[in-house]
Amino acid sequence: MDSSAAPTNASNCTDALAYSSCSPAPSPGSWVNLSHLDGNLSDPCGPNRTDLGGRDSLCPPTGSPSMITAITIMALYSIVCVVGLFGNFLVMYVIVRYTKMKTATNIYIFNLALADALATSTLPFQSVNYLMGTWPFGTILCKIVISIDYYNMFTSIFTLCTMSVDRYIAVCHPVKALDFRTPRNAKIINVCNWILSSAIGLPVMFMATTKYRQGSIDCTLTFSHPTWYWENLLKICVFIFAFIMPVLIITVCYGLMILRLKSVRMLSGSKEKDRNLRRITRMVLVVVAVFIVCWTPIHIYVIIKALVTIPETTFQTVSWHFCIALGYTNSCLNPVLYAFLDENFKRCFREFCIPTSSNIEQQNSTRIRQNTRDHPSTANTVDRTNHQLENLEAETAPLP
């Protein structure tokens, strides 16, 4: 949500991020742009320019960032981009490809992977913006990149919040869960989460624009007067609705689940189902915890910068970039967490990366089944393969 490209000349820019000296220039989307959230209450960089910090009319730190710093940031962004795109697209492929992966929880995970993939796809643009000190991609891409950052932040936290409520229902109200926790309902809720995210994403898209200043182009958010009021209103809304409220809901849900799990030995009447329920609950909890750890620093940083003046130092510059990078890093961590914490994802990832003869045979059997529906005369052939297929399915069935 950082709204601007870093200007090439910072000599007369002394208050771009709500304090008396320019903050380090993240990239157009850095903080996931929350950098916008550390807004600029009085901006000497230009009389009509307003920024929320970070990308929003970014000013680079006094003096250009060192080559080592720039290379380090670009290397980190490159790793996050490659791992994030590959990992999240793999997660989406696995959920679409394998029928047994189409559970309510995995439908939510698909939505999370989609939001993360979109966010990591903006990193190449932000890297170029950071290195060149200008935004060379035009107004349309400026609007798209900034809005994607906001959409990612809100959709991700809304989805995690939904997953926590879903886990609460599964653990504490198992009977009601039978009717409520269906893939169809999960898809409807995912659509609702994107619609809710549009309450911020669409206005931001309309506010984003490019501005020419001192030989460079800024990708920035523009606000109506009084700019300080609308800047701070946006920062407060993001902090409350994308952090405080979801974290409170998640905390309450898991608090109630912990009490339930401690007080009841058997939740479903089956040890196997119980083990599966606890495993999925643990995975969702870890994903939520990692998200909070990755996003808390930038939220806190933005609020502090909005309230007090922070003198620019090397430590401040490094910590700022670290907070921004940490937010983006979360987008590539989730697929890794699924691979380590969920046996079903682990097995599907392994089958995708290292196809085995049994996997190929199972796929061929599936094709034969489909052909038989179209050509009933081949029923005898299918009968001979059914026994093999059943054995293969038993061997490769997702672990509970």
UniProtKB/Swiss-Prot annotation:
Effect of mutating residue 275 to A: Impairs interaction with calmodulin
GO BP terms, alphabetized: adenylate cyclase-inhibiting G protein-coupled acetylcholine receptor signaling pathway; adenylate cyclase-inhibiting G protein-coupled receptor signaling pathway; behavioral response to ethanol; G protein-coupled opioid receptor signaling pathway; G protein-coupled receptor signaling pathway; G protein-coupled receptor signaling pathway, coupled to cyclic nucleotide second messenger; negative regulation of cell population proliferation; negative regulation of cytosolic calcium ion concentration
Maturation and modification: Phosphorylated. Differentially phosphorylated in basal and agonist-induced conditions. Agonist-mediated phosphorylation modulates receptor internalization. Phosphorylated by GRK2 in a agonist-dependent manner. Phosphorylation at Tyr-168 requires receptor activation, is dependent on non-receptor protein tyrosine kinase Src and results in a decrease in agonist efficacy by reducing G-protein coupling efficiency. Phosphorylated on tyrosine residues; the phosphorylation is involved in agonist-induced G-protein-independent receptor down-regulation.
Pfam families to which the protein is assigned, alphabetical: 7tm_1 (PF00001)
Topological domain ranges for the Extracellular compartment: 1-68, 132-142, 208-230, 307-314
Membrane-protein topology: Multi-pass membrane protein
Disulfide bonds: 142-219
Tissue and organ expression note: Expressed in brain. Isoform 16 and isoform 17 are detected in brain.
Stretches that traverse the bilayer: 69-93, 107-131, 143-165, 186-207, 231-255, 280-306, 315-338
Sequence motif NPxxY, residues: 334-338
Lipid-modified residues, S-palmitoyl cysteine kind: 353
Phosphoserine: modified positions: 365, 377
Sites bearing Phosphotyrosine, chain numbering: 168
Keywords: Cell membrane, Cell projection, Cytoplasm, Disulfide bond, Endosome, G-protein coupled receptor, Glycoprotein, Lipoprotein, Membrane, Palmitate, Phosphoprotein, Receptor, Transducer, Transmembrane, Transmembrane helix, Ubl conjugation
GO cellular component terms given for this protein: axon; dendrite; endoplasmic reticulum; endosome; Golgi apparatus; neuron projection; perikaryon; plasma membrane
Subcellular location(s) per record: Cell membrane; Cell projection, Axon; Perikaryon; Cell projection, Dendrite
InterPro entries linked to this entry: GPCR_Rhodpsn, GPCR_Rhodpsn_7TM, Mu_opioid_rcpt, Opioid_rcpt
Cytoplasmic topology ranges: 94-106, 166-185, 256-279, 339-400
Glycosylation sites: 9, 12, 33, 40, 48
PTM sites of type Phosphothreonine: 372, 396
Function: Receptor for endogenous opioids such as beta-endorphin and endomorphin. Receptor for natural and synthetic opioids including morphine, heroin, DAMGO, fentanyl, etorphine, buprenorphin and methadone. Also activated by enkephalin peptides, such as Met-enkephalin or Met-enkephalin-Arg-Phe, with higher affinity for Met-enkephalin-Arg-Phe.
Additional free-text comment from the UniProt record: OPRM1 is the main physiological target for most clinically important opioid analgesics. OPRM1-mediated inhibition of voltage-gated calcium channels on central presynaptic terminals of primary afferent nociceptors is thought to be one of the primary mechanisms mediating analgesia at the spinal level. Opioid-induced hyperalgesic responses are observed following both acute and chronic dosing associated with cellular excitation.
Family: Belongs to the G-protein coupled receptor 1 family.
Protein name listed in UniProt: Mu-type opioid receptor
Origin organism lineage: Eukaryota, Metazoa, Chordata, Craniata, Vertebrata
